[in-house]
């Protein structure tokens, strides 16, 4: 794991850990020369089965994000691939996931979430999905759920975690792998019902 206070690639000073998933840890880092904060996603090779396959997926994820430019999507600024770790340097998104917002609402005896806000979030999601689906090579996100949507302090959303995204390939009959979150995944994500497509993200 990266240590707090260490400097990555000679320019990113690690400030603190801000998140952790199954295979990755996310840190807040500062580029002192540019005086700008970034998020660094670290995936360590040790303890990961078949890292070659995982690495291939990470490269695909970063290549997809680097090809996109939309205000509701994070930007990747650097990829550092060495013998021990795979690091992705990207925009630091301040705020909470919609999943956290919903949980906090329930925990505080129904703290209201206003209809106007829900409509705004829905419009923004439609905007970013339309952008993804109308690329020259359409991008299918495949894991649209509240946990993957960040709500920033200004009310704008940001769709994060493109680990399951794929390029839609005309002529394919099935996805090569079945990915998605139970409870959100569309029938075709379980195999045997055709490849995932724009309608898959709408179903999610």
Task: Write out the residue ranges for each language-model feature.
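Protein kinase glycine-rich loop
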Residues: 15-21, 26
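Activation segment signature within eukaryotic-like protein kinase domains
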Residues: 121-122
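Protein kinase catalytic-loop region centered on the HRD/HxD motif
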Residues: 126-139
């Amino acid at each position: 794991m990266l240590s707090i206070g260490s400097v990555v690639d000679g320019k990113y000073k690690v400030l603190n850990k801000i998140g952790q998933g199954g295979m990755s840890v996310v840190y807040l880092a500062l580029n002192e020369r540019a005086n700008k904060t970034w998020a660094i996603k670290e995936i360590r090779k040790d303890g990961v089965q078949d890292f070659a396959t995982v690495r291939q997926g990470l490269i695909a994820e970063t290549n997809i994000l680097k090809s996109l430019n939309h205000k509701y999507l994070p930007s990747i600024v650097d990829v550092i691939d060495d013998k021990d770790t795979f690091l992705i340097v990207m925009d630091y998104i301040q705020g909470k996931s919609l999943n956290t917002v919903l949980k906090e609402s329930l925990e505080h005896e129904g703290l209201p979430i206003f209809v106007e806000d829900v409509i705004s979030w829905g419009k923004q999601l439609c905007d970013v999905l339309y952008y993804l689906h109308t690329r020259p090579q359409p991008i299918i996100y495949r894991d649209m759920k509240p946990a993957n949507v960040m709500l920033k302090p200004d009310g704008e959303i940001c769709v994060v975690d493109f680990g399951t995204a794929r390029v839609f390939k005309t002529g394919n009959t099935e996805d090569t792998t079945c990915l998605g979150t139970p409870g959100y995944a569309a029938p075709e994500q379980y195999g045997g019902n055709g490849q995932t497509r724009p309608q898959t993200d709408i179903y999610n």
